[in-house]
Amino acid sequence: MNKKKILIGTDTVSGIAPQILKAISLASNENSLPYGEDIYTKKCRNIVRKIFEKQDLEIIPMMSGTASNSLALSSFLRSYGNVLCHSESHINKDEGGAPEFFSGGGKLLSISNSIGKLTSKEVNEKLDELNFKGKQNSKICGISITQLA
């Protein structure tokens, strides 16, 4: 019996679905305006605006999860700031320092526990600890809630 190996660690280790490859191939034969003015980005933007019922909503299509996460974090994380996250979170373990690089030196400040997810109690304790230390502390700019329990 032949068994096919399945890699589930990330979507970047496998090929793409035939339907996606066909759509990309067809689109590559067209001439389009750049910088979000192509018909595909416009269609996507309109769909997202309809879903969120917000006509001035903007989207930025990205090519990878690391780019997406780094851009999102760098939009509010400054060189003097921190983002709280779990020590086992994807942004802390798998982004290779990209969020810190693209934010100009902002820092991911991790919290560890045995369940692999942040709890509101731990977040509040960390915020209290940082507030107690005073003004020389880096500012908390955000909390990664992807691993919130």
Question: PLM features: residue spans?
Answer:
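Structured catalytic cores of enzymes that bind and process phosphorylated ligands/cofactors
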Residues: 10, 56-59, 143-148
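Conserved core of the PLP fold type I
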Residues: 56-77, 111-113
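Conserved N-terminal alpha-helix of the aminotransferase class I/II PLP-enzyme fold
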Residues: 17-65, 87-88, 93, 98
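N-terminal amphipathic/basic leader segments beginning at the initiator methionine
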Residues: 1-23
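Conserved PLP-anchoring active-site segment centered on the Schiff-base-forming lysine
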Residues: 75-93
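Solvent-exposed alpha-helices and their adjacent loops that cap or buttress functional pockets
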Residues: 51-54, 76, 91, 100-103, ...
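PLP-dependent aminotransferase-class I/II
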Residues: 103-148
